Design a protein with these regions (language model features):
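Membrane-interface alpha helices of multi-pass inner-membrane proteins
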Residues: 147-164
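Membrane-interface transmembrane helices that cradle and orient dolichyl/undecaprenyl
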Residues: 130-148
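Hydrophobic/aromatic-rich transmembrane helices and adjacent perimembrane loops
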Residues: 287-320
């Protein structure tokens, strides 16, 4: 039922209304050039992270320059992330009872905007961040389960290879070691080795192909962006993110009023606070902020949202809150079809490609600089 609800919201718009966007076209061109035999960073002068470039190359080999293929892949990744996160939370008993509320919230809020259907490096990297969770929260003992922390660091390294600023989530891993591990220093070193391992392999490859300098300049040593810059008007981003923000605020208030719980559950909640802070740090230091960047917050909103919808408030009130959220998502997502975008005043033009390409220049004198 959960998957059917998600597909019911997403598929009609993906199949019938596929606005072409500039970021996706850039990713397609990267994949197309790689499929033509060019080398990343040496022949293709672009700062797309290596693992994301690999995904775009595979998509080009499989489907060519197809916006539909990119949208379906993004939708599949979003669904996979929701199911993985819910399975991790249930398997490790982070709540008083097992349920599917986190996945439901993840998928509903992930349907808020068509930007979540754009296959971005952030969306790809977010999958590896979620995959790292069950490994970094291991209650390790000396001599036991050491490999799990290495794998957790390895997953965080793969996330950074999709989008370099995701390396900030090493903070989440370090705090997880502090909260859960018995030998903090040794466990931290093990996780850091796991994080560095994929980069060591990749750097060896680029040094072997005489592309090490370009790899360092275009990916590994890129300057950190310390100013907030919005790709879309900030007012539009605020309107679209109002629903997740309200849910997160109510959820945090509900989590603060919880009765005494197991030590593991308390530590996991503290870790998700660190996740939330790391997500906001990555989001607001990006060179181009849009709704798609807030995909990093979805795991935290889904986790804390469970406390809101299982709180001691009256059941009818909780049902009304969820129905209002669902209705708000549907209205925002289908606003163009139902003809209310002129009232909401949401401008998507900074993301979209022009419907009519500029006229070709013929029989004119041009200056090439």
């Amino acid at each position: 039922m959960l998957i059917l609800l998600f597909l019911g919201i997403q598929l009609p718009l993906i199949l019938l209304d596929i606005p072409a966007t500039a970021p996706e076209l850039l990713h397609m061109l990267v994949g197309e050039r790689l499929a033509d035999g060019y080398s990343m960073y040496r022949d293709i002068y672009d700062n797309t992270a290596p693992l994301s470039a690999l995904v775009f190359w595979l998509l080009d080999v499989a489907a060519g320059r197809s916006f539909l293929a990119y949208r379906l892949t993004a939708m599949g990744l979003l669904l996979l992330q929701a199911l993985l996160l819910n399975n991790i939370l249930n398997r490790h008993n982070v709540y008083a009872s097992k349920n599917y509320l986190p996945a439901l919230l993840y998928l509903v809020l992930g349907s808020l905007s068509f930007e979540y259907n754009m296959l971005t490096p952030l969306l790809i990297g977010n999958t590896f961040l979620i995959l790292s969770l069950p490994y970094i929260i291991t209650l390790s003992r000396e001599g036991f389960d050491n490999s799990r922390l290495f794998v957790g660091g390895f997953m965080l390294g793969l996330a950074a290879m999709c989008f370099l600023p995701l390396g900030v989530f090493l903070l989440v891993g370090i705090f997880a070691v502090i909260f859960f591990a018995s030998n903090t220093f040794r466990s931290t070193m093990l996780m850091l080795c796991g994080f560095a391992f994929p980069y060591a392999v990749l750097l060896t490859y680029y040094l072997y192909t005489n592309t090490g300098q370009e790899f360092l300049e275009l990916h590994l040593l890129r300057p950190w962006q310390l100013q907030v810059a919005f790709l879309r008007p900030p007012a539009d981003v605020a309107k679209l993110m109002a629903i997740p923000a309200v849910i997160l605020l109510l959820s945090l208030l509900s989590a603060a009023s919880l009765p005494q719980r197991l030590v593991f559950q308390v530590k996991f909640q503290q870790l998700m606070w660190v996740w939330l802070v790391a997500s906001l740090l990555v989001i607001f230091t990006r060179d181009e902020i849009s709704v798609a960047t807030f995909v990093l917050v979805l795991p935290a909103v889904a986790y804390f949202g469970e406390f809101l919808f299982t709180s001691n408030r009256k059941p009818w009130l909780l049902n009304v809150i969820f129905l209002v959220v669902l209705a708000g998502v549907l209205v925002l997502r289908y606003r163009r079809i139902i003809g209310i975008n002129e009232f909401l005043l949401l401008d998507e033009s900074p993301l979209l490609l022009p419907e009519q390409p500029p006229l070709a220049i013929q029989n004119k004198t041009v200056v090439v600089l």
